[in-house]
Amino acid sequence: LMQNIQKNAGKLSCSFHKIIKMKKKYTDSCRLFVLKSNRKENQEKMFEVGEYIVYGCKGVCQVEEITHIDIPGSNKDRLYYVLAPLEDRNGKIYAPTDNAKVAMRKVITRQEAEQLIEEMPQIEELWVANEKQRELQYKEALKTCDFRAWISIIKTLYFRKKERIAQGKKITSLDERYLKAAENELYGELSLILGLPKSQMEDFICRKLEA
């Protein structure tokens, strides 16, 4: 997304630039990253086999099984979700069903996705007061599994990239890494919900904002 914006600097071909024109700032607290819908309930209720969920920074996963696992030193009575990441179907994640350390939620609905796309211009930047804490705040924002957090990171890093280019500098490797991570999370979930290839998500968002 940001690469496309940079290529078209000065003559953006789609209205997605409205998202990044509004240079606002969040406070340092990641507590502000909360979906309007009641996502807190997701970790209070069991997910079901076959459901798609977002698990931490691992992106969208499908619940393949809910079972006990026999691992030395573990509580054999503890239940685990066996998760299959969409981007790595051969991979497996064993997540305790009562795990409060890693954010888990159901994927958003199509209606919620369309609403969030419409709200993108109003989503604020991530305000980083202490440069030494920048990477930590990026990590914490990504780990919230919050759609708005991903968009906030993208907007923040776009402006940083723009400022560095104006100074004759390149984007830092740290910023580049988290920009790609946020875009991957954003497009990955939208792709599943809207039934479109990830590569088409940017154009889809543009069309929605132009409508």
Question: Residue ranges of each PLM-predicted region?
Answer:
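Short beta-strand-centered aromatic/proline hotspots
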Residues: G59-I69
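Charge/polar-rich, low-complexity and marginally structured segments
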Residues: T97-A211
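A short macromolecule-binding patch
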Residues: V82, D88-T97
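Loop/turn positions that initiate beta-strands
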Residues: G50-E51
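Short, solvent-exposed secondary-structure boundary/capping segments
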Residues: I69-Y80
